[in-house]
Amino acid sequence: PVYVNETTKIWCGKISDGEFKGAFVKILNYGELDDKAAKNELKNVLREEVNTLKQVSKCSKRVPSVKDYWDDTRESRYVVIMDTMPGVSLRAWLDKHQRDELQAKDIFIRKCLVIQICEIMRDISNKYPVLVHRDLKPENIFVNFNKETKKWDIYIIDFGCANLNYIRNIGTTNYQAPEQLGIRNTRVSITNKTDIFAIGQIMYEMLLGR
C-alpha cells in the first residue's frame, strides 16, 4: 500500500482496460469499527467521494476518474478503483527540492505550480460551483515533469471531504480555513474561499519551507 491508516488502505497497481495502466485501489475497512453510526458515516463519505469524482473528472483531466467501485459486504469493506496520477506528491517533491535559499528559477517553478492548482480548481468551480475540496494540502496534490512540454504538471486527488453538507472539523490542521475550525456538527455555508485559504497556506509553505 502507498497509504495506510486505521480504516483505509490505498494500493497502487495495474488494471487491464484494453491496455495496462496504473491504478489506485482504495479500500475502506468499515468492518473494523464497532459503532454502527461511525461505520455508516465512513461508507457515506466514500460514496460521496465516488459521486464527486464522477462529476469532477468531467471538469478537468487533472483529477482521477473512477474505473469501478463496490461494497464488499462479505469482507466488510468498500473498494474503489481509480486512475493513478503520474508523478509524486507535492509533499515528496518539496522534500526532494528543498533549498536553504530559493533562487529565481525555484520561485518561478513554484509560482507556476500554484497557478496550475488555482486553474484546476477554477475549472472545477466553473462547471461544478457547489463543490469545495476542503482538504487541499501537499499530500493531495501530485507533481509530474512532462518530458514533452518540459514543464511540471499538477494533479489533484482525494475529494473525499467534498460535497459533505456539514462541518465536522474536516480537513487537515495547518491548511484548514477558520470557518472549518469554528463550528462543529453545524450546518453552515462553505464556499470555494475555503479552498483558496488552503492554496494560500500551500503557497506559503512552498516559498518559505514551513
Predicted regions and their residues:
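ATP-binding glycine-rich loop module of kinase domains
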Residues: 8-47
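Short beta-strand micro-motifs within the conserved protein kinase catalytic domain, predominantly
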Residues: 65-78
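Conserved short submotifs of the Hanks-type protein kinase catalytic core
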Residues: 75-89
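Catalytic-loop of the protein kinase fold
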Residues: 125-144
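Activation segment/activation loop of eukaryotic-type protein kinase catalytic domains
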Residues: 139-175
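Conserved end of the kinase activation segment
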Residues: 180-192
